[in-house]
Regions:
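Short amphipathic beta-strand starts and helix->beta connectors
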Residues: 38-42
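Acidic, proline/glycine-rich low-complexity IDRs
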Residues: 1-37, 47-51, 56-166
Length: 166
């Protein structure tokens, strides 16, 4: 039993060290949580290096990683992401996304961020997206799996004004 403990600690130490290295090099790290219910991806380092809330998206890792990567690249180009407006971060013909504040206290579930930032409470925004048919999570016709997954981190905001694209 005692022999297993050092290996667990060393795994956590390596993960923490890798996170700090990536944050210093790139200004952030993307952390996938494939076994989350639902799966999700979040950032660590935006609050330190960009003075911007951390980001989280409830999506399978293969979908969530590129979504957050594009959002971070937009930040690095000077776009400030905020709750409310619609954004098209990829191309003009892509589905818009929106951000909403993560509910108070839920950031404590982002354990690696808590360890690196030395706090369980920090500002974070959830990236919200539509289902394949273009329905937002608050739309009753939205795919239930997409709608439910996105209710994990924030109170579903009111529908955006469709002419507010950035």
């Amino acid at each position: 039993m005692d022999q297993a403990l050092p290996s667990l600690v060393s795994v956590a130490d390596r993960q923490h060290s890798r996170t700090l290295t990536e944050m210093r090099q790139y200004g952030f790290r993307l952390c996938p949580v494939p076994d989350g219910r639902p799966p999700y991806v979040y950032t660590i380092g935006l609050s330190l290096y960009s003075q911007h809330p951390e980001l989280v998206v409830s999506a399978p890792v293969a979908v969530g990683l590129p979504m957050l990567r594009q959002a971070v690249w937009a930040l690095q180009r000077g776009v400030r992401l905020a709750p409310g407006p619609l954004y098209r971060l990829w191309r003009a013909d892509t589905t818009p996304i929106q951000f909403a504040p993560v509910r108070a206290g839920l950031t404590r579930a982002l354990s690696l961020a808590c360890a690196v930032l030395h706090t369980r409470y920090f500002a974070a925004l959830q990236l919200l997206y539509t289902d394949a048919a273009g329905h937002w999570p608050w739309d009753p016709t939205c795919d239930p799996a997409i709608s439910q997954a996105q209710r994990r981190w924030c109170a579903v905001p009111r529908p955006p004004h469709l002419d507010e694209y950035l």
